[in-house]
Amino acid sequence: MLVAVVKELKQGEGRVACTPENVRKLTDAGHKVIVEKNAGIGSGFSNDMYEKEGAKIVTHEQAWEADLVIKVKEPHESEYQYFKKNQIIWGFLHLASSKEIVEKMQEVGVTAISGETIIKNGKAELLAPMSAIAGQRSAIMGAYYSEAQHGGQGTLVTGVHENVDIPGSTYVIFGGGVAATNAANVALGLNAKVIIIELNDDRIKYLQDMYAEKDVTVVKSTPENLAEQIKKADVFISTILIPGAKPPKLVTREMVKSMKKGSVLIDIAIDQGGTIETIRPTTISDPVYEEEGVIHYGVPNQPGAVPRTSTMALAQGNIDYILEICDKGLEQAIKDNEALSTGVNIYQGQVTNQGLASSHDLDYKEILNVIE
C-alpha cells in the first residue's frame, strides 16, 4: 500500500500526521511512504529527516496519488479534485460540519476515516490528547483576551492578593469531559474560580470528588442553569462534542447578550459546528471578533498553534491503526479491530457513521454490513 503524508493547508496549521519515527515503522514493515515537501516543517521535521527514515519527498499533487492519505485536518476544498475511487483519507475530518465534502467523497467513492470518532473502551482515544491541548490552550486564551488591549474587560484573571484582595476571574466551562477538565485545571492554576456545567449525573459526582478541595462548582446542565451561570462568566468555554454529528445550538444569542461586556467566549468544538449560536470559525492568525459586546474565539484547530507538542501526541496515537490497515488491508483491519471500525465515516462513498448521516440527512449503513 502506498502511504502519503501531506502538508496541511488550513491556515495556521503546523501539525503533521506522521513523524519520521513513524515513517520508519511503516517502511520497516515493507510499506512505501511518500511525504509532501515541507509537510513536517511546522513541527520541526525537515525533509531530510523523513528521507533518512525511508520516505520519498514528493509534490502536493504526487502525494494525493497514494492509496492511503494521512492528514491532520479535513481536506481543503482545493484538494477535492485529487480524490479518487477507493482512496482512503485519514485525519480529524469533522465531516458533520460540511455536507459539500461528504457529497464529494460519495460522488468519487472515497473511504474516510475520522480519528475523532474512533471509540475504544468507551473513550475517544485519538481525540483525547487533542482535546486536552485545546482545553488547556482555551483557558490561556481566555486570560489573554480578557486584557483591555485585546478588547476584553481589562481584568487580570489571577486577581491580586498581595496586601489586597482583588478576586480573580470566573471561568464557566460547559461540559465535563477531557477538554473541560484540562481547561479547569489551567484556570485553577491561574487562581480563577471555576464553574463546570455537566449533564451526566455520574460524571457530576466524579467531578465533585475530583475537585472537592478546589474552588470549583459543578452544576447540572439544564437550559435554566446554563442561562444563569453564563451571566457569571468572565471566560466561557464550551466543550460539547457529539462524535461524528453536529451538536445543537445550546447557547442562544439571548444568553450571549446576558454576558458581561468584554467577557470572552470560546467554543472548542467549533470544527464540528459548535454549540453557540453567535460563533463562527476563525483562524489562528485572526482568532477573535466581537458580537453582542462579547469577545468570540472560534479557532477550530487550536492544537495546530502548538504543533511540536500536538504532532507527537497525535502521531503516537494513530500509528498502530495505520500499520494495521497497511499490513492487513482495510477490510480485514476493520473486521479485526472494533475501535477502527468506529472511525470509518464513509466507506467507498457510503456513509457508515450514524451521527454523520443524521447531520446531513443521508442514507446510513453499518460498516460491517457494507464490507461483507
UniProtKB/Swiss-Prot annotation:
It catalyses: L-alanine + NAD(+) + H2O = pyruvate + NH4(+) + NADH + H(+). Gene3D superfamilies: NAD(P)-binding Rossmann-like Domain (3.40.50.720). The keyword NAD applies. It comes from the Bacteria. It is an enzyme of class 1 (oxidoreductase). Pathway: Amino-acid degradation; L-alanine degradation via dehydrogenase pathway; NH(3) and pyruvate from L-alanine: step 1/1. Its EC number is 1.4.1.1. One of its GO terms (cellular component) is plasma membrane. PROSITE patterns: ALADH_PNT_1, ALADH_PNT_2. CDD domains: L-AlaDH. NAD(+) binds at residues 170-200. The active site is at H94. Signal peptide: none annotated. Keywords: NAD, Oxidoreductase. One of its GO terms (molecular function) is alanine dehydrogenase activity. InterPro entries: Ala_DH, Ala_DH/PNT_CS2, AlaDH/PNT_CS1, AlaDH/PNT_N, AlaDH/PNT_NAD(H)-bd, NAD(P)-bd_dom_sf. May play a role in cell wall synthesis as L-alanine is an important constituent of the peptidoglycan layer. NCBIfam families: alaDH (TIGR00518). This is Alanine dehydrogenase 1.
